[in-house]
Amino acid sequence: MSHLWCWLFLVLCLACLVLSIEAKDSDGDGLLDVDEINVYFTDPYNADSDQDGLTDGLEVNRHQTHPQDKDTDDDSIGDGVEVNNLGTNPKDPDSDDDGLTDGAEVNLYRTDPLDADSTTTGCPMGGGAEVRHRPQNGDTDDDGLTDGAEVNVHRTNPQDGDSDDDGLSDGAEVNTYHSNPKDGDSDDDGVSDGAEVNPKLKDSDGDGLTDEEEIKLYRTDPFCADSDFDGLLDGEEVKVHKTNPLDGDSDDDGLGDGAEVTHFNTNPLDADSDNDGLDDGEEINVHGTDPEDPDSDNDGLNDGDEVNVYNTDPEEDDSDEDGVCDGAEVNVHHTNPKDEDSDNDGIPDGAEINTHKTDPNDEDSDDDGIADGAEVTLTDSDGDGLPDEDEVALYNTNPANADSDYDGLTDGAEVKRYQSNPLDKDTDDDGLGDGVEVTVGTDPHDATVTTTGSRTAVEINVHGSDPNDEDTDDDGLTDGAEVNLHRTDPEDADTDDDGLTDGAEVNTYRTNPKLADSDGDGLSDGAEVNTHKSDPNDGDSDDDGVPDAAEAKVKDSDGDGLSDTDEVRFRTNPKLADTDFDGLTDGAEILKHKTDPRNRDTDGDGVADGLEVNTYGSDPKDADTDDDGLTDGAEINVHDTNPTDADSDDDGLSDGAEVMTYHTNAKDGDSDDDGKADGAEVSASTDPWRSDHSV
């Protein structure tokens, strides 16, 4: 009996010992030692078996990562860095599903691994491109590797951009040259890695800077000739223009450095090249003024003062059209350049200064108790029958000259009796002066002077046109219409020499055939119609706030439909019509198709944008144009189906269903040739791959 009790006691002790061992967590990582040994194969005496910054317990119980693999998702970022520093998913190599692994985004492209729309801040040419520092990426020494990558992956010094002092930054060694950032001579040949880089071509991108200068001095990309995409080579920026090769707009004036140097001839280091108080970009893009001329309209006020102080028009020398230029009003007469009658006496400032010699700032210049305007109204200085005030304010005639147009009729007679124009000696443009017509008894309003027969004396004696040809100059307007209606020259098909015939101007474009620039935008009507395809009746045809003439001055070097300035803004190549070589010009991509001119396959379906538009008719912005479950690229390159037809063989099954679900021939409506369409067989639960066979 005593033996039995001894045996039971021994069994009980052993059980307690086992329970004690099984309940033990030696390293305090949240996993029992027995589980670490038998289940997870981790070290029960090391809380972080894979040294990734997460305890084994956290990896198993919270994050479901591998406690023996410091980088569970193989994205080149340790699990601990992902959880503790970046906030990315340590089990998903591409946390934001943008097609780039988290490691590539953090260590190579320097984009946000949690934002699918984040963009790189340097040349997308590879890891050697030096980019601006992003604090969230934590790159203390700006060597192109995050501190976490340096410490946890490469074991380099996160505070030394060139840990092995070989002349190459740690980032360049890892991402571009694939050399050892901790070994100055990775191949042990006696020549440092920095000295070996491109030994026969010291300037890899041909930008005028050696690779060593780009890496060590300027932080530019030795494989990208124009690191900031401003249209100037990095070497040209550093050595010639002294601009920042990492900043496309060195002076922050709204114009790219390349545009300033190449097109506008402004100073890319001075935001206000003409020192007129307006930034160069503001002058070109907003006001249409000349960034190299401080006084674009030559009115005596600089452009900046006109815009910022006086609120006058920097392109109009007489903003209030009172006959006195803005500068004279401000600096000489001290009148208001935006008010044609500064003293409100009823006489425009110009008339007071130039005609009446009164004070434009004093409504009663002679202090006689009668306003200047009233005094002028009562006076007829030239005795032509029109008060001086009416001559100035209504008819714009000379109050000191009774016959302003020297046609033999007084201004008063023309206005009151004959209703002819006192400023036009030949009101009806028939070649006979108004005074002559009154003298001989003809009508100064009627250009037709009847003779015996059907011909007119005007045609025979004055205009020289052919009385037997109703359209002497073949411009599309009859001679009568030209003389009597439009006041154009019946012998000159293009009276205003603007490049459009008078008939085209009147009948087609509705422009003024006597005015070469109908909309006053600085471009002739012919140039607008024939060259620039702009509206000759609208000074800003595209309503973008920039006058047509200013836009016409902007160069389109590659003829892709985008101005070089716009290309700098869109970061395309202004000297290459198709920057991404996808078969569509940059202009067509931006203005028409809304695709990415720097990505030859905008929707990532495996088919270049140009082929989608020009060859297959598919949508370059939709990877699956016909929504059949197959990408356009798969349809074109693999299955030879129609990417714009969801059911290429019209059998009642979509191409995607045939390929991925039923494994039938998406190009053959009856895969088994049994006389029944694949779709009908699926509906009838028969096998579309076997003749009349039930599934």
From Swiss-Prot:
Acidic residues compositional bias, start-end: 271-283, 291-306, 313-324, 361-370, 381-392, 467-477, 491-500, 537-546
Biased composition (Basic and acidic residues): 59-70, 589-603, 665-679
TSP type-3 repeat ranges per the UniProt record: 24-38, 47-56, 70-82, 184-196, 202-214, 248-260, 294-308, 317-329, 340-352, 363-375, 379-393, 402-414, 425-437, 470-482, 493-505, 516-528, 539-551, 555-569, 600-609, 623-635, 646-658
Sequence segments annotated as region (Disordered): 45-695
GO cellular component terms, semicolon-separated: endoplasmic reticulum; extracellular region
Secretion signal, residue range per the UniProt entry: 1-20
Name of a matching Pfam family: TSP3_bac
Compartments reported by the entry: Secreted; Endoplasmic reticulum
Record-level Gene Ontology MF annotations: calcium ion binding
Record keywords: Calcium, Endoplasmic reticulum, Repeat, Secreted, Signal
Amino-acid biosynthesis among keywords: no
Function: May function as a calcium-binding protein.
The protein's name in its UniProt record: Calcium-binding acidic-repeat protein
Source species: Euglena gracilis
Lineage of source species: Eukaryota, Discoba, Euglenozoa, Euglenida, Spirocuta
